Amino acid sequence: QQTVYTYIQSRFYRSPEVLLGLPYSSAIDMWSLGCIAVELFLGLPIFPGTSEYNQVCRIVDMLGLPPQFMLEQGRQTNEFFNVHTDAYGRRTYRLKPLEQYSHEHHVQEQPSKQYFPGSTLPEIIRLVPLSRRSGRAADMEKEMANRTAFIDFVSGLLNINPYERWTPQQAKMHPFITGEPLTRPWQPTAARPATPPPSAASSHTVALQGAPMPAGPTYRDEYAPSVPVHG
């Protein structure tokens, strides 16, 4: 039997499923790898959270909300999100405002400091100044092509949904690793275990600014068989 710990991974590299208190697998290591790869490129952590709440906020601000099934099944979801259920039983999740979280936890959370221009991962990577040796047009074109491949690569590692996050076997075949040209967004040939069907709560909605998100799957035995959660 696997024991799932509530404190695992250094905060800057902690995966969404761990933050939300969900069962986890080796997919958490691929999230950490994505964080480290981007940090090596930027020179600073991509998600330098000052607390678990701030960590969740930074991830959501950059990558969007976790899938519905993660929010509905996460043991820690109510720590970070408010949930509203309408008359039709549809749920809407919103990040708790900084003031509310601070009041509930008797802490003084501070707004996130912004270290990079841009708000999305592609913007942040593309806006990093080019080096002096990239002054020639051909060098600049090559550098931007490398960045495009890098963005595609780390996007597969930093997929919030652990079912869709790339495995090591998938990631090592990416053109950024193999050196082949990237002509279109890359799709791995081998997938993780089949994604489970949508839950019965498929009519629920998840929102950051009021926009609904599609329903997601539920955890199943292939992902975390008979996992007791301690802590």
Residue spans of the language-model regions?
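Intrinsically disordered, low-complexity regulatory tails and linkers that flank structured modules
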Residues: G179-G231
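End-of-activation segment of Hanks-type protein kinase domains
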Residues: E17-L22, L40
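Conserved catalytic-loop aspartate of Hanks-type protein kinases
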Residues: D29
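Activation segment
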Residues: T6, G21-S26, F47
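Conserved activation segment of eukaryotic-like protein kinases, specifically the C-terminal portion
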Residues: T3-V18
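Terminal C-lobe "cap" of eukaryotic-type protein kinase domains
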Residues: M144, N159-E164, Q170-R184
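C-terminal lobe substrate-recognition/regulatory segment of protein kinase catalytic domains
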Residues: P66-F153
